[in-house]
Regions:
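ATP-dependent small-molecule kinase phosphotransfer cores
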Residues: 37-116
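Hydrophobic anchor at the beta1->P-loop junction of P-loop NTPases
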Residues: 4-6
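Small-molecule kinase domains that catalyze NTP-dependent phosphoryl transfer to phosphate-bearing small molecules
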Residues: 102, 132, 154-234
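ATP-dependent NMP and nucleoside kinases share a basic, alpha-helical "lid"
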Residues: 100-153
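Walker A/P-loop
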Residues: 15
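Short beta-strand-centered segment that lines the nucleotide-binding/catalytic pocket of NTP-utilizing
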Residues: 27-40
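ATP-binding Walker
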Residues: 12
Length: 243
């Protein structure tokens, strides 16, 4: 199976590309944001650990039945904001749960649905290290000023200072460009973006004889996957040394 990791920066158009791949090309999309919400639903181990770690008072209850229906996300955000230790604790609770759901989703598409390709839509693909498990990593990118203007147009309540702060809170788009196998530039019109997406689909997803051949020979596919994993690990180590 070819696992494609799709990412980008805030307001660069990743969601637009993800929607195109799903609706126009009928490719299965596994959305990390959806899985992240599912991973902390009431009754899950991650949900219970969040309450026991950060406070039972975070629980939200149904007014009529008193049943726990979730937790106060803004309040949790305030408790971990600016506290690196607390943030790491939260990540250690949530990230493994999300990864497990992601593995199950990939296995479902492969073994049950018989898919030969799946797209992982992950905002923090490189930051989380999940790119190491992808056959191809794709970044949707724009120039920094275009990114800023689109964010201000999308979230009109933000000041320019706040918008720049949100962009700065993530890895820079140029840094992601360097790590990606494929870069889709989204600095023009919607029509131009669709053309670029089509070129990527035709080149990497449809016409890739290598992946088609490997799907028919699982041992070779596993060896190639191991090669990709090691290559990405070495690339990440070199990057960490430079930074």
């Amino acid at each position: 199976m070819l696992i494609v990791g799709l990412t980008g920066g805030i307001a660069t158009g990743k969601s637009t590309v993800s929607k195109l791949l799903q609706e126009k090309y009928h490719l299965p999309i596994i959305d990390a944001d959806i899985l992240a919400r599912k991973a902390v639903e009431p009754g899950t181990r991650a949900f219970n650990r969040i309450l026991s770690t950060f406070g039972e008072d975070l629980a939200l209850h149904d007014e009529k039945t008193g049943k726990v229906i979730g937790f106060d996300r803004p309040a949790l955000g305030r408790r971990v904001f600016g506290d690196e230790v607390a943030r790491k604790k939260l990540n250690r609770i949530v990230h493994p749960a999300v990864r497990w759901l992601m593995v199950k989703a990939v296995m479902w598409e492969w073994l049950v649905m018989g898919r030969g390709l799946v797209v992982l839509d992950i905002p923090l693909l490189f930051e989380s290290g999940l790119d190491q498990f992808c056959g191809i990593s794709v970044v949707v990118a724009t120039g920094e000023e275009v990114q800023l203007q689109r964010l201000l147009e999308r979230d009109k309540h933000l000041s320019e200072q706040d918008a720049r702060g949100r962009i700065a809170s993530q890895w820079g788009i140029n840094e992601k460009r360097k790590l990606a196998d494929v870069v889709i530039e989204n600095d023009s019109t919607r029509e131009e973006l669709e053309k670029r997406v089509d070129q990527v689909v035709q080149k990497y997803f449809v016409r890739s004889r290598l992946w088609t051949w490997m799907l028919r020979m699982p041992p070779v596919g596993l060896l190639f996957a191991l090669f990709i994993f090691i290559r990405r690990r070495l690339t990440r180590k070199r990057r960490d040394k430079v930074s």
